[in-house]
UniProtKB/Swiss-Prot annotation:
Coiled coil region boundaries: none
Family: Belongs to the UPF0389 family.
Membrane topology (UniProt): Single-pass membrane protein
Compartments (UniProt record): Membrane
One annotated Gene Ontology cellular component of this protein: membrane
One Pfam family here: DUF1075
Residue spans of biased composition, Basic and acidic residues class: 59-69
Keyword list, A-Z: Membrane, Transmembrane, Transmembrane helix
Protein name from the UniProt record: Protein FAM162B
InterPro entries, alphabetized: DUF1075
Region (Disordered), start-end ranges: 43-69
Residues spanning the membrane: 110-129
Lineage top rank: taxon: Eukaryota
Length: 163
């Protein structure tokens, strides 16, 4: 696409759009469709892409809202976030925006739960560390005891080997 646009500009087939800042008012308006290869989107300053009709003259496009069949997980999320009160209340097809909103709300709730659990875990670690300090337990004492045990085992192994 970029190579095509670059070659069009080098051949001076491109034009300065009428809506570009600094464009002179007498810029000739060529049909956009003749400048672009087939299959690529054609945009102009006016209304709809690729047409020279004034904006608003094109027929309105009737858009059918996309419907989505929710999975069991989606249904549980819709219930958990409070969108529906019971599983039977959930219609067979719902808009994807509703599912996205429910998922976002569920993400926020899950984050709040994790924040709460993290704070509770911090207090639990603080309490257990205070109890360990009262018993005079520390990582240093554990490491010294472990190394003393290893030395003792090594000495016993050396005595058994010497016999």
């Amino acid at each position: 696409m970029l190579a095509t646009v670059g070659s069009l500009l080098r051949l001076r087939l491109g034009r300065i759009p009428c809506c570009a800042p600094g464009a002179p008012p007498e810029v000739e308006r060529r049909p956009v469709a003749s400048l672009w290869p087939r299959g690529h989107p054609q945009y102009s300053c006016g209304g709809s892409p690729g047409s020279s009709e004034p904006p608003g003259s094109a027929e309105k496009v009737h858009r059918v809202p996309a419907e989505h069949k929710p999975s069991q997980f989606d249904k549980r999320i819709l219930l958990w976030t409070g969108r529906f009160k019971a599983m039977e209340d959930i219609p067979p097809r719902i808009p994807p925006e509703m599912i996205d909103a429910a998922r976002n709300k569920a993400r926020v709730k899950a984050c709040y739960i994790m924040i709460g659990l993290t704070i509770i875990a911090c207090f639990a670690v603080i309490a257990s560390a205070k109890r360990a300090a009262e018993r005079h337990e520390s990582l240093t004492s554990w490491n010294l005891a472990k190394k003393a045990k290893w030395r003792e085992e090594a000495a016993l192994a050396a005595q058994a080997k010497a016999k």
